[in-house]
């Protein structure tokens, strides 16, 4: 799915899509999960907001370059989510939240110097996962 600049994809029920790209925004309703995954490499530069959850499944890389504000969880079950800032993963929880970011067979890729907030409560699922840091950058 490609979301055009100026458009908003309102996700009001749990949904699975093959791809996610574009400069438009995503609004996640409370408690729902948006799962995306395919073998391609996609970039979403719009803002993901709301109280829902994101799951990256399948192979390929999903680059989240917007200043995201969603408050739900992020699970990487396959492929890679690539970010250049902590807010690529949405709003930081007000206190440590176990499993706010779950690696379960996929990878988180950092592409710039930044600090991943400890309140995200990184968890490893049964399939484990990895955190990859681009050469010449620092993730703390």
Language-model-detected regions and their locations in the chain:
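Beta-strand repeat architectures
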Residues: 1-42, 49-63, 71-139
């Amino acid at each position: 799915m490609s979301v055009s600049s100026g458009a908003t994809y309102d996700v009001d029920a749990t949904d699975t899509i093959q791809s996610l790209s574009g400069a438009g925004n995503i609004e996640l309703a409370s408690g729902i999960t948006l799962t995306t995954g395919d073998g391609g490499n996609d970039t979403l530069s719009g803002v993901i907001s709301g109280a829902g959850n994101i799951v990256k499944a399948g192979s390929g890389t999903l680059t989240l370059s917007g200043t995201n504000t969603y408050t739900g969880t992020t699970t990487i079950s396959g492929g890679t989510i690539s970010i250049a800032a902590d807010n690529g993963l949405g709003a930081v929880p007000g206190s440590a939240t176990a499993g706010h970011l779950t690696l379960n067979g996929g990878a988180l890729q950092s592409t710039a110097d930044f600090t991943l907030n400890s309140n995200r409560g990184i968890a490893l699922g049964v399939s484990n996962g990895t955190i990859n840091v681009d050469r010449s950058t620092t993730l703390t």
